[in-house]
């Protein structure tokens, strides 16, 4: 797997909150979250949609970016969501 293939993503959950994570394969990770095999948070508050915040980075950079996103306020995450790349399944 390419070392510069990691992405930071936001998931909009059914409670209108955002869940942030990283993955080298966001589509596969969304499937895991959707089927209850992802994070505990997304097992409780089901995913509605996912968007890529940043991509094409190594794992360490992705982890640092994830931490930065998690420190944002809800309003800042909403703004980031609006600017983020839509997933092919989102129309």
Swiss-Prot record:
Alphabetical list of Gene3D superfamilies matching this protein: GIY-YIG endonuclease
Organism (species): Neisseria meningitidis serogroup B (strain ATCC BAA-335 / MC58)
Name of the featured protein: UPF0213 protein NMB0361
Residue ranges that the Swiss-Prot or TrEMBL entry lists as coiled coil: none
InterPro entries: GIY-YIG_endonuc, GIY-YIG_endonuc_sf, UPF0213_domain
Top-level taxon in the UniProt lineage: Bacteria
Domain GIY-YIG stretches: 4-83
Family per record: Belongs to the UPF0213 family.
């Amino acid at each position: 797997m390419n070392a510069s293939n990691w992405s930071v993503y936001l998931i909009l959950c059914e409670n209108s909150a955002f869940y942030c994570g990283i993955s080298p394969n966001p589509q596969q990770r969304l499937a895991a979250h959707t089927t209850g095999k992802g994070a505990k948070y997304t097992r409780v508050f089901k995913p509605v949609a996912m968007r890529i915040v940043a991509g094409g980075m190594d794992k360490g950079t992705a982890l640092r970016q994830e931490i930065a996103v998690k420190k944002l306020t809800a309003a800042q995450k909403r703004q980031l969501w609006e600017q983020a790349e839509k997933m092919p399944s989102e129309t």
